[in-house]
Each structure stands twice: as structure tokens, then as C-alpha cells.
Amino acid sequence: TASVLSGLRYLSYWWDDRKFSIVSLILIVVFGYIFCVYFYYIFKRMKDRIDLLFVLFMIPIGISFMFVMLPDYVPDEQSHFQRAYLISNLNIKTIKEVYIDSDYGIQKLKSYAEVFNNFGFNFHPTYTLFEEASNYNALVYLVPGIALGLGKILHLSLYTCYYLGRMANLALFISVVSYSIKITPKLKNVFFVFCFNPMLIQLAASYSSDCSIIAACILSVAYFLYLFDKEKIETKDIMIVCSLIIFIFLTKYVYLPIFGIYFGVIPKLLHIS
């Protein structure tokens, strides 16, 4: 993580100046080489543990995505961030108005150098009213909201909190997908490759509400494969599936048809233990 951040910080200044530098070229080559060696070494050591392999691959890639994407430059991210900020104030009402640290401005930062210059602490914040908070269910913003709240308690600057929330969303995605890969008895490689879709990583490394929703859908498919291969379905399995259905229903019910695959395990319901 430290290597990723250091490399991105240096490259940000080079990119903003748009001047060729042999040092920058060498850094890019070395940075890329380290990544390749790291991936090869981890793959050789842990190719039988696809779930852990996913975690170790996704962490540096996800963090790179997270810092390369400037704040609010992911589609609709400003509305998602404002909703998460509202949740961090322990306000779960569906309203559009939220007071945010005055350092915040929609697409305010125009360069990567500005991002790193805005990291730090702010012990005397002032607040400005914004009116673009999304109206999605509070459940999808709970994890980044908690991270934002923790950042405010520690008096971190607005954009330090911003990236802390992004990191929390990324951690949620990595955790859920890793568990999904772990429990599925088959198609582990398919899950692994699918979750490295660049558009999916972009959502996971931002405030997008689709991050937790898609993660829940991936878990739902993996859990179906787990139950389909299981001899007897237990009561706890029914509770987990019902919880996933309720979550999807409350957050984005258009994804509910995905649970139609569970008709494939209905015969096993006669053997609930």
C-alpha cells in the first residue's frame, strides 16, 4: 500500500506538469516490474487458494483505481458521497440537503497533486449546504458512512475522509467477493476473473451504491452453488438467503429475479435439518 501511494504521488506531479522525465520513466518501469513480480510470486505460492489470491491481487489494484480517480469524477459519485456523509451524521432520512465541510466542492480537485495536498487534519471546519444527496436506502451507504464518521471524529480533513470512505467501500467489496469465492464449490476461476472487470473495480473503489448491491448479487449466486452442492440445507442457510433477498428488495429490487436460480434447490428443502 505504501509503495502504491508513493508511486502515485510522484506520478501525479509528473502527470500535472506533462513534462518528460527519465526519472519518471524509470519509476514507471520499476513500479510495473514490482507489480508483475508480486503477482507472479503470489500466484505461484497460493494458486490453490483463489479467495486469498483475489484479496492479495485486488488490494493494490483497487487502491490504484481509488487514487487515480479524482473525487466525484465517477458518474453520480457526488450524490452518493453526500448521502454517505448524511449517514455519517446519523441521519438516515431520505433528504437531499446535507451540510458538508466547506473544503468540499463538486469536481473541485482538477489534478492528482491537489489530492495529496489536501490530505491532513482540520480541527476547525466550516460547513456549506449541498442539495444533491441520493435517495437510495441507507443500507448501501452504511459502511462508507461509518468510515466518514470515524474520520470526522479524528478531525481528518474533508478529502482524507473522502478517500477513507472509498477505501471502506472497496474493503466491503473485497471481503464479500473473497467469501463468495471461498464458499462456491465450482467456478471459482470464473468468479475471480469476473470481479476484475475494470468497470466493477471502478464502482467498488468509489461511493457508488452499486458496490454493495453487486457484491450481494455475487454472494447470492455463490451461495446458490454452495447449497446446490450441499447434501442438506440447514435453517441458517434459509436465514442467510432470506437476508440477501430482503437486502436486495430494500436497496434495488430490479435485481430480485436473480434469486430465481434458487428454484433449483427446492427439492432439498424437504431435508432441512
Located regions from the model:
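Transmembrane-helix motifs of polytopic, lipid-linked glycan transferases
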Residues: 36-41, 146, 160-187, 219
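Interfacial juxtamembrane loops and adjacent helix segments
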Residues: 88-164
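Transmembrane-helix signature of polytopic, membrane-embedded enzymes
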Residues: 48-49, 156-159, 177-198
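Perimembrane helix-loop-helix junctions
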Residues: 223-232, 258-273
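Start-transfer (signal-anchor) and selected internal transmembrane alpha helices
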Residues: 13-64, 273
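Short acidic/glycine- and proline-prone juxtamembrane loop motifs at membrane-interface regions
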Residues: 206-213
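Specific aromatic-rich, kink-prone transmembrane helix
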Residues: 179, 213-230, 244-245
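Membrane-interface alpha helices of multi-pass inner-membrane proteins
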Residues: 201-202, 237-253, 258-264
